[in-house]
C-alpha cells in the first residue's frame, strides 16, 4: 500500500485528491495538512511513502517545506502539485529536491502515474519540462535575468507582479515588512530595475505570472 500525505490549504483540493487516490488500488491518503507548519508535524508523526505538496500556503510556504523535508528526510519523495505553470516554478522545485512537478490542471491518470513513479525512486516531469531542462543544460550562458535571483527573491518578484503589496506578501510568508522590502530592493538591483511597474512588465513578458 502506497501511503500518501496531502499538503494543501484548500479543503476541496484535499478532498478531490483523496477521491482520486482512493479509486486506485494499492494507494491511499493516510495523512493531510492544511499549511506548512502543520505539514512538518504531520509528516514526522505519520510516516508516508510520498508527499503531495502545494506551493502557495499560509504560515510556511511549500518551497520552504520542500527544502526542510529534503534536508531532514532526503529519501522521502515529494511531488509538487501546484496551480503555477511549469515555467514559473518547476525548475526551482526540482533543484530544491522535489521528485516531480505537476500542475493542478493535470489529468487524474497523470497524477497516479506520477505517484507510482516517484515512489519507485524515479522523477516525474512532463515531456515539455523535460525538453526545457535539457535545453537549459545546453544554454547555461544565456540564462534569463530572473534566474540569478534566490528562491525567496523569485517568490517575492512573482507576488509583487501579481499585484500584492509588501504588507500582503509579509503576511502570507510570515516575514516582516522590513524583510520583504529588503528582498524587493535586492530584486530591483539584480534586475537593474527602478520600480514595481518594471518588475511587473518583466514578469508578464517572461511568463512568470498568469
Language-model regions: role of each:
Residues 32-50:
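Acidic, metal-coordinating helix/loop segments flanking the phosphotransfer/catalytic sites
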Residues 41, 63-75:
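Short amphipathic alpha-helix used as the core "switch/output" element in two-component signaling
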Residues 143-178:
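Helix-turn-helix DNA-binding segment
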